[in-house]
Amino acid sequence: MKTRNLIFLVALISQIAYSQKVDVYQRPIQVERSRDFDAIHYKITLNVDLDKKLLMGENQVTMTPLNDRLSKCVLDAEYLVVNSIMNRDGKKLSFEQKDNQVFIELNHSYNHTDTIQFTVKYTLDKPNLGLRFIDESPTNPRLVSSDCFPNKARQWIPCYDYPNDKVTTEMIVRVDEKYKVLSNGRLVGVTDNRQLITDNRQPATKTWHWCQELPHSTYLINLSIGDYEVIADSLGSLPVNYWVYHWNADDARSSFSKTPHMISFFSKLYGYDYPWAKYDQVITPYMGGGAEATTATLLGEGVVMDKKAEQDFSWERVIAHEIAHQWWGDLITLQSWEHTWLNESFGTYSDYLYTRNEYGEDAGAYDLLGKKNQYLNEAHNRYIRPIVFTRYNDPGDNFDSHTYPKGANVLHLLRYILGDDTFFRTLSTFLHQNEFKPVDTHDLMKTVKEVSGKNMDWFFDQYVFSPGHAVLEVTKSWDGASKTLKVNVIQKQDSLPGVPIYTIPVNLGFSFADKKIVKEVWLKNKMESFEFVFDSEPLLIRFDEGNYLLKEVTFRKTLKELVYQAENDDMIGRLSAVDELKSFSGDPSAIEEWSKRAASDSFWAVRQAALVNLAKYSGKNYLDLIKGTARDENSKVRQSAIRILGDQKSPSLLKLFKEVYEADNSYVVQAEALRSIGKCGGKKQLAFLKIAEGRKSYRNVVGKAAIEAISMIR
């Protein structure tokens, strides 16, 4: 599951002590749920009336006792009303429904070799959580949409609703014939029920039969009903379908077009072919991002957009993230909710891996930097906790920036330590050994040791079972007489809440006029000193060459070093140098370097950061350069340039803003141009802006910007 998060730019966070504004340690300790039986199969039969928002259902439960002398069992059942329970012989079983559960007397004592089967009949009237009846609106048709995460399957299916049990499922759904039905697994068939009609006033119905023949957890069950248009795609013989609204079907094919490629990419990357019968994606209005379900992912309706919007609003990473869950979360599933990272950290790291593969090393590095900064924002402004954390009120409490982006960065460091080949062989082995099973972190640790031959318990103790991250202060000194460079590192993280002194490898990069030398050292103590002998003093020392550590670091550099770094380092180093040059904002060399980076750096985020600093610290001397960046190839840079120019509030720029509005191929840039017109234009511009208000755009960003601009003038 993923929500769409903002990517934060590089920021030096000065505080070392952590601000625990949310005391997560006051939450209750949770333990894995115990069970008396192994659920084998749920055959769910539903009669769904969308007009009345009524569901009449039955679940035929097949189970096996885990121990002998099982004479009663408990299923979860919240909101729904159980009407009767009958065994396979048609005999009624006694039951009591209370405390969101149904307690069933089996009328017989069963042993662990027995198979038990009974059918629960129930009614659900006007639900709104686990299963939503969604009214028709200007933006969506009438729909039914499930939301089983994390423990809401029980709100429309009586079942054992905890992820440590996996079960095969059938979904047999009778609905008005005008609707289509999607669920997990293979479509067995669709039956026309016209021959069953005895009263002409009865609506014609169809029965859709889906079968999920490989086991999965109940929170991964999906039921989606509506007048969808289904766009058929494929990856070889694998059916791939997109369930969308009729009015956005033309855009949907483009929005989802990379799905088969993503499935192929992850199959090869993880050394495990896509494990299921098909892959569907279905849009729903209440979803802010995406929610995985076995073979049938739910996505917010914002995922569908026209080609013009994709450069600024693309959901490509969200789509990739949810596809990755078909392995990480669906094929293998967390055994209990404290191990959420086995789903979400792996899903988040997967969307980084896809981004890097698809758009290059710099785009991947920037994505991973954004993930790191999301975590740091939470660590400094909310709380720190271990990634594996047993304290929560609700399982959803742990689906945060520790589980998603921090865990992704931890996996990146583990990959560096193990090496690419060993890391990916470990993941492939882990998937094959644990396919269709619930797992916990110790299962992963066992596989790491088995494949790599390395005991990595120390790594998991520091990064998964302990809170926090390394906060480092780095200094250096050069002795010209002995040609010795000394690098000092102090770990300054607050250890009071259980943050360790880290044992971590780090690469030190030493740049010279004709070469770069990289040396790996290990930090093991609070204070470390490392000495190196070189023929000359390095032009630049890069701490954490390759950007593998989850860290905050202070390493002061001279103006000369920062200028060299801005021109010669990798993208992350250049971006950092552009930021750190603010310490020398009054120096012409800093202004000149920002000008160079804004005009010609190879990566858009460096150009954008340099542009922002140039505008802030150089006055109006560089307006012509900023005008030039308003034609940058990247829409984010163009948007920043137009915003900066708009802040000048100069009527002389009106012509430029109107040209940009009329010609730019980005809704976001067009919107910024309108706001800039509002900043510098008078009432003569109102007619122009009123026309712009009616221009169609994704999420109405252009129309909203026109309204903002009009309010500025009035």
Q: Where are the regions that the model predicts?
A:
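Alpha-helix N-cap/helix-start positions at coil->helix boundaries
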Residues: M571-I572, S602-A605, K620, S635-K636, ...
